Amino acid sequence: MTLQISAQVVKALRDKTGAGMMDCKKALQANNGNEEKALESLRQKGLASANKKSNRTAIEGLLESYIHTGGRIGVLVEVNCETDFVARRPEFQKLAKDIAMQIAASPNVEYVSTQDIPSEIINLEQRVEAGKDDLKNKPVDRIETIIEGRMKKRLKELSLLDQMFIRNQDISIEDLINQNIAVLGENIKIRRFVRFLLGGGEENLKVNFADEVADILNKK
């Protein structure tokens, strides 16, 4: 006998993952109604689909821009897919807009992924961490472990794909892209981006800009 899952539970899982209603229902039924296990299975399904398509050429897509209210911060991002047909799909266009707004709200992000971070930047960050006062008088093996953990965290701060999606803190931007790969059936890549800030540094802003962008996203 097939396990009956309420529409409310299915919708809650869809809101968390972005997967289709039927996919969410099947995942819940396959996992005896356990939402966490169903969520994990959907993520694995999206990742498997993404891995199958990751080597396929993605040269279509669009350039998406976002200018925040007041013109203080602007973003231009190139998001690629395989065909012009998918580039015109509302789901793909929404993804590109969400990514642009994510970049606007992420002042520390400088690269698409950790693999894009130049070795000289990594070496510089390692020297900075190694020179911090709180590491003095600690055993050498302990210092290496601390630096490794801090470096992993720091490199993720610089990587767009490792950021938690401001509209859904349960998934990363990489998860978001993988979900859309599963839905749209094509390889999707963030090719490059640039973030502009009027007048210089973030310290000149008098508001929590990430919260502002999150509010705008959640109202859409």
UniProtKB/Swiss-Prot annotation:
Database matches in Gene3D superfamilies: 1.10.286.20, DNA helicase RuvA subunit, C-terminal domain, Elongation factor Ts, dimerisation domain
Compartmental location: Plastid, Chloroplast
GO cellular component, one term: mitochondrion
GO molecular function: translation elongation factor activity
InterPro entries attached to this UniProt entry: EF-Ts_dimer_sf, Transl_elong_EFTs/EF1B, Transl_elong_EFTs/EF1B_dimer, Transl_elong_Ts_CS, UBA-like_sf
Pfam short name (any one): EF_TS
SUPFAM superfamilies documented for this protein: Elongation factor Ts (EF-Ts), dimerisation domain, UBA-like
UniProt key word Cell membrane: no
Main localization of the protein described in the UniProt heading: plastid
Residue stretches spanning the membrane: none
Keyword terms: Chloroplast, Elongation factor, Plastid, Protein biosynthesis
NCBIfam families with a match to the protein in the record: tsf
Biological role stated in the UniProt entry: Associates with the EF-Tu.GDP complex and induces the exchange of GDP to GTP. It remains bound to the aminoacyl-tRNA.EF-Tu.GTP complex up to the GTP hydrolysis stage on the ribosome.
UniProt family annotation: Belongs to the EF-Ts family.
Protein name: Elongation factor Ts, chloroplastic
Lineage: Eukaryota, Rhodophyta, Bangiophyceae, Bangiales, Bangiaceae
